């Protein structure tokens, strides 16, 4: 790029690509580029990341950028999700339904039981001083249908209207539940979405992964 200055030029100009600019953070006199969330708490920088080594590029006020590598946690949480489709084809008695939906005689659904197993795994460098930096666990569901509801012990936790993307739910706020019920409602009406909607009425896949709060 070409720069036309008025007055005294700056000592250092950093030109970022669009992708880097979308992943840029400024703390103090430093510019940080990272693909993962970065925030400051009590004067300490933390990166929210997974189980891989992550690179953070740092720009000072002058000089060339330097790369910092944040190591993965020594104690990790591996989460597996087992799914079972029930024989129900009508919304459970506790499912929240609008009056309009209740009037639809053809309004069938599919109900799935989800069982989540949380296992702690220690890497070869872990010892008695190693800490558990678990920040959250995200449950991701790929389903075809108009919308879905997630329940725990008959209580609605959250719901989602299909927009062509996977549905991801943070589980920390719900106490990392082990058993959940998913209700999927059929895709019936042609509605405009940015992404191609996933038609049908079924759960295709459910998975979960953990993220960690790592000091930079």
Residue locations for each model-derived region?
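Non-catalytic C-terminal accessory domains or segments of carbohydrate-active enzymes
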Residues: 1-216
């Amino acid at each position: 790029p070409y720069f036309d200055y008025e007055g005294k030029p700056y000592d250092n100009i950093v030109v970022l690509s669009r992708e880097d600019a979308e992943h840029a953070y400024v703390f103090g006199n430093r510019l940080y580029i990272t693909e993962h969330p970065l925030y400051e708490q009590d004067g300490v920088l933390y990166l929210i990341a997974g189980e891989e080594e992550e690179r953070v590029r740092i720009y000072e006020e002058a000089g060339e950028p330097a790369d910092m590598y944040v190591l993965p946690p020594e104690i990790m949480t591996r989460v597996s999700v087992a799914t079972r489709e029930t024989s129900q084809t009508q919304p459970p008695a506790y499912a929240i339904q609008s009056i309009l939906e209740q009037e639809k005689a053809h309004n069938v659904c599919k109900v799935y039981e989800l069982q989540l197993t949380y296992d702690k795994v220690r890497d070869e460098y872990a010892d008695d001083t190693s800490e558990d930096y678990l920040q959250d666990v995200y449950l991701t569901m790929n389903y075809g249908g108009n919308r879905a509801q997630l329940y725990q012990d008959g209580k609605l936790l959250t719901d989602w209207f299909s927009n062509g993307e996977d549905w991801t739910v943070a589980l920390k706020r719900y106490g990392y539940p082990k058993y959940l019920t998913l209700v999927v409602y059929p895709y019936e009406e042609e509605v405009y979405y940015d992404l191609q909607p996933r038609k049908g009425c079924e759960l295709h896949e459910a998975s979960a992964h953990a993220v960690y709060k790592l000091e930079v």
